[in-house]
């Protein structure tokens, strides 16, 4: 029987955070962002193993951090996010037939969303979490508006993104061979003209990228009394 493995890309340097260490190792309420994320993934009973991609020079620190998560394997990441995910895909055991990819700096994902994306992918082969755009979206060029896009058709993409292994592996190998560049995993699947299902995401499933995001994360944890009471269900 095939199992589901998670790939957690967390090898970025976090330059937009303006700190002297990668953002995933910064703390929220005395615990690193990365550990909050791994705690959330650990609440998903269908995940057999997690592969954590970190900067090569932070592997020892990461192994120390995850000692309480025996199902987590630390792997050296690459220069870009897609390089890290590719390293993760190439590290998976043969029995892993499904792959869940989740950003290491999205610590507030609920187990309900993880399960919804996983169950949808089981039916369709590929599924992503996303939320509808609420702001007006315009396309610009050279500081001038070119057009206003139809907001009803715009989705703001998150992770988790879940795929049948052969689909996402083929998509990433095609990206290597053809020089494709993408900021999310589903974009490579789309370029193979394969369908990708959308699951309604969560507004609180924030990617902690900027100092303002970090402030919001601290506030959110304080307001919610920590993660333990909320990762089992959506808000």
Swiss-Prot record:
Keyword field: Isoprene biosynthesis, Nucleotidyltransferase, Transferase
Q: Write down the InterPro entries for this protein, in alphabetical order.
A: IspD, IspD/TarI, IspD/TarI_cytidylyltransf_bact, ISPD_synthase_CS, Nucleotide-diphossugar_trans
Pathway assignment reads: Isoprenoid biosynthesis; isopentenyl diphosphate biosynthesis via DXP pathway; isopentenyl diphosphate from 1-deoxy-D-xylulose 5-phosphate: step 2/6
Q: Does the keyword Membrane apply?
A: no
What are the GO MF terms of this UniProt record? 2-C-methyl-D-erythritol 4-phosphate cytidylyltransferase activity
- Transmembrane stretches in the record are none
Reaction(s) catalysed by this chain, per the record, are:
2-C-methyl-D-erythritol 4-phosphate + CTP + H(+) = 4-CDP-2-C-methyl-D-erythritol + diphosphate
Q: Does the keyword Nucleotidyltransferase apply?
A: yes
Class of the enzyme per the UniProt entry, highest EC level: transferase
Coiled-coil regions listed in the entry: none
Give the site residues for Transition state stabilizer.
16, 23
Family of this protein: Belongs to the IspD/TarI cytidylyltransferase family. IspD subfamily.
Q: Which NCBIfam families match?
A: ispD (TIGR00453)
List the HAMAP family. Answer: IspD
- Functional note: Catalyzes the formation of 4-diphosphocytidyl-2-C-methyl-D-erythritol from CTP and 2-C-methyl-D-erythritol 4-phosphate (MEP).
Protein name, per record? 2-C-methyl-D-erythritol 4-phosphate cytidylyltransferase
* Gene name of this polypeptide: ispD
């Amino acid at each position: 029987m095939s199992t589901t493995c998670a790939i957690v890309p967390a090898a970025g340097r976090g330059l937009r955070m303006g700190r002297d260490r990668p953002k995933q190792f910064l703390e929220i309420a005395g615990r690193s962002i990365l550990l909050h994320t791994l705690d959330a993934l650990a609440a998903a009973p269908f995940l057999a193993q997690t592969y954590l991609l970190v900067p090569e020079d932070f592997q020892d620190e990461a192994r120390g951090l995850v000692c309480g998560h025996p199902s987590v394997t630390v792997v050296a990441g690459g220069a870009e996010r897609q390089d890290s995910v590719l390293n993760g895909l190439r590290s998976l055991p043969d029995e892993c037939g499904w792959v869940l990819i989740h950003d290491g700096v999205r610590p507030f994902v609920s187990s309900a969303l993880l399960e919804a994306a996983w169950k949808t992918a089981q039916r369709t082969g590929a599924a992503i979490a996303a939320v509808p755009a609420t702001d007006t979206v315009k396309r610009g060029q050279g500081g001038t508006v070119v057009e206003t896009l139809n907001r009803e058709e715009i989705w703001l993409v998150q992770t988790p993104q879940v795929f049948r292994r052969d689909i996402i592996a083929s998509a990433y190998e095609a990206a290597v061979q053809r020089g494709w560049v993408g900021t999310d995993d589903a974009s490579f699947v789309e370029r193979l003209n394969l369908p990708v299902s959308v699951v309604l995401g969560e507004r609180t499933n924030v990617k902690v990228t900027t100092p303002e995001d970090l402030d919001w994360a601290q506030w959110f944890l304080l307001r919610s009394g920590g993660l333990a009471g909320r990762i089992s269900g959506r808000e």
